[in-house]
């Protein structure tokens, strides 16, 4: 496959086969044979297959609708059998965030693989827990999840396949008995409690809140449970813990207790919205919102992670 950064995509033709030339540039009048036209993209990391938008027709980037009508395109596309598939659906927030490229903005996705995409909001399948009038979108200008009124009109980008990280059941997480938790889906190990907190239910102590630079250093300096390679998670990694079926916090609290209601956590990811870059991403776990905050002016908690190898 091809892709920027750590992304790995394969372009697919209308029948689902891999097109012969993978590094071609999209053209509306192009052909699959010369690699200038494709209908879907397979993410070789997640296994998900994504619909490609077109300037006109059923899959046009101009087609928008309310959340209540979000499944209309999926019904049409399944009848069409796009890319040989008939299980197209609206993606979850977790799934749609997997194609966000936090290394860029406007748009925050891999443009050569996803032509005709817009720096706009796209619906997900998830309602906002605790806010009955709203549903989750992903804003592809900034690459963040947002809560929007269900009556708003936004695009849908369809997905096909299953993604294990969308499940938050106990089988996914293994308590290692030393204050760490292993995620068998992502291959990451997390500290069970935020920095500064300890105990079976993470109720002892007080949460550490620092500016971004201090948080990065605190993570690097940690030797918790005998490991010396702790770090702040990047945006992608932190988002894998957000369970939007819950709120306040949007977490599986049977795995990650949060009795002190610590909600705001730094990530290591920089927000490319200013030059020079002065902001970084954080996750607000009240409902799972992604936000930008000035690195030197905002103090947030740290939730440490390492590669579980």
Feature locations, PLM:
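Glycine-aromatic-enriched surface loops/turns that form tight recognition elements
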Residues: 1-89, 93-231, 235-309
């Amino acid at each position: 496959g091809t892709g920027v950064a750590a992304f790995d995509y394969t372009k697919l033709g209308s029948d689902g086969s891999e097109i012969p030339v993978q590094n071609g540039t999209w053209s509306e009048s192009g052909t699959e044979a010369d690699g200038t036209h494709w209908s879907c993209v397979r993410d070789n990391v997640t296994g998900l297959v994504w619909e490609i938008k077109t300037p006109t027709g059923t899959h046009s980037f101009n087609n928008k609708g309310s959340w209540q009508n979000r499944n209309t395109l999926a019904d049409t596309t399944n009848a069409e059998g796009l890319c040989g598939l008939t299980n197209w659906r609206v993606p979850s927030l977790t799934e749609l965030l997997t194609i966000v490229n936090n290394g860029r903005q406007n748009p925050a996705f891999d443009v050569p693989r996803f032509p005709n995409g817009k720096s706009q909001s796209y619906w997900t399948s998830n309602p906002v827990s605790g806010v009955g009038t709203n549903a989750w979108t992903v804003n592809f200008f900034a690459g963040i999840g947002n809560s929007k009124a269900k009556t708003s009109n936004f695009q849908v980008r369809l997905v096909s396949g299953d993604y294990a990280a969308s499940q938050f059941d106990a089988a996914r997480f293994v308590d290692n008995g030393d204050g760490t938790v292993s995620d068998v889906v992502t291959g990451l190990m997390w500290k069970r409690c935020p920095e500064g907190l300890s105990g079976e239910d993470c109720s002892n102590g007080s949460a550490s809140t620092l500016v971004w630079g201090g948080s990065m250093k605190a993570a690097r300096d940690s030797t918790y449970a005998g490991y010396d390679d702790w770090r702040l998670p990047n945006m992608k990694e932190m988002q894998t813990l957000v369970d939007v079926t819950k709120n306040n916090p949007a977490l599986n609290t049977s795995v990650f207790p949060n009795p002190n209601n610590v909600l705001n956590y730094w990530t290591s990811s920089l927000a490319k919205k200013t030059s020079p870059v002065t902001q970084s991403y954080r996750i607000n776990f009240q409902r799972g919102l992604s936000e930008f905050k000035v690195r030197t002016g905002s103090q947030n908690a740290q939730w440490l992670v390492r590669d579980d190898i």
